[in-house]
Design a protein with these regions (language model features):
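Bacterial N-terminal signal peptides that target proteins for export
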Residues: 2-16
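C-terminal motif of bacterial Sec signal peptides marking the signal peptidase cleavage site
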Residues: 21-24
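Bacterial signal peptide processing site
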Residues: 26-28
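N-terminal secretory signal peptides
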Residues: 36-113
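Mid-length scaffold segments of soluble, non-membrane domains
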Residues: 85-151
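Acidic, glycine-rich flexible loop segments
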Residues: 137-173
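Low-complexity, intrinsically disordered Gly/Pro/Thr-rich segments
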Residues: 172-188
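Acidic/polar low-complexity flexible segments
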Residues: 183-206
Length: 206
C-alpha cells in the first residue's frame, strides 16, 4: 500500500513539475496594443531626458519640452495599407528646414482609409539606400501649425515583401528640429499633404 501511495504521489509530483516547466517555457502573453504604445512613449521620454548625445533635446530646454505631448491613443488611426507603384517621377529632392535639399526616391504610394475616408501617402527611401530596408513617410495634415508642428510629422516603416503595411498614426512623431533647429528636417512634399486633420501621435504641448 505504501508503495502504491508512493507511486501515486510520485506521479502527482511529476505532473506538477511538468506543468511548472511548461508554464516556464511557454511564451509570455502578448502586450496589449495600448500598453505597447504607452511603453514606447515612456521609453522615448526617458531617452530624450538622458544626457546621451543622441538626445535631440538640449538640456536647457528639457523642463519646457518634456515629457512629450501626444493625442489620446485611438485605434481608429491604426490601419492596414497597401503599397502601390508611385505615379510620376521616382526621384525627388525634398526641401529641408535648413534650406538644403535631401535626395529621395519614391518607393510607392500607400493606400489606406482612416475613419472611413480613403487616403494616400507616398513612401520614400533615401537615395543612398539601395536595399530600401526602411520606408520614410513624411506627411502634413490640417492639424499642422495649431495642434502639431507646422512642418509636418513622420512615420517610419520596415519594408515588407508583400506590399502590405501596418500604418499606425499613433506612432507618428515630430521632426527633431522641433526641439533643436540645428537638425536638418525634410518637409513633406505636396503629394503628402492631407486635407483632413490626423489627431493621432505626437503633438505640440498645449
Amino acid at each position: 500500500m505504501r508503495y502504491a501511495d508512493g507511486m501515486r504521489w510520485t506521479g502527482l509530483g511529476s505532473l506538477v513539475l511538468v506543468t511548472v516547466l511548461a508554464a516556464a517555457c511557454s511564451p509570455p502573453p502578448p502586450v496589449p496594443y495600448q500598453q505597447q504604445i504607452q511603453n514606447q512613449r515612456a521609453a522615448k521620454d526617458a531617452a530624450f531626458a538622458s544626457d546621451s548625445p543622441e538626445s535631440p533635446v538640449p538640456a536647457a530646454d528639457r523642463a519646457r519640452l518634456l515629457p512629450l505631448a501626444y493625442f489620446p491613443i485611438d485605434e481608429g488611426y491604426h490601419v492596414p495599407a497597401r503599397l502601390a507603384p508611385a505615379p510620376g517621377e521616382v526621384a525627388l529632392e525634398m526641401p529641408t528646414s535648413t534650406g538644403q535639399r535631401r535626395k529621395m526616391r519614391r518607393a510607392g504610394q500607400l493606400r489606406f482609409s482612416v475613419k472611413g475616408q480613403p487616403l494616400t501617402l507616398t513612401a520614400f527611401v533615401e537615395e543612398s539606400d539601395q536595399v530600401m530596408q526602411r520606408l520614410f513617410v513624411p506627411f502634413a495634415d490640417a492639424s499642422n501649425g495649431t495642434e502639431t508642428y507646422i512642418g509636418g510629422r513622420y512615420l517610419d516603416l520596415d519594408r515588407t515583401t508583400t506590399g502590405l503595411y501596418d500604418l499606425d498614426f499613433n506612432r507618428a512623431y515630430q521632426p527633431y528640429c522641433v526641439y533643436n533647429p540645428q537638425y536638418d528636417c525634410p518637409y513633406p512634399p505636396r503629394e503628402n499633404r492631407l486635407a483632413t486633420p490626423i489627431r493621432s501621435g505626437e503633438r505640440l504641448r498645449p
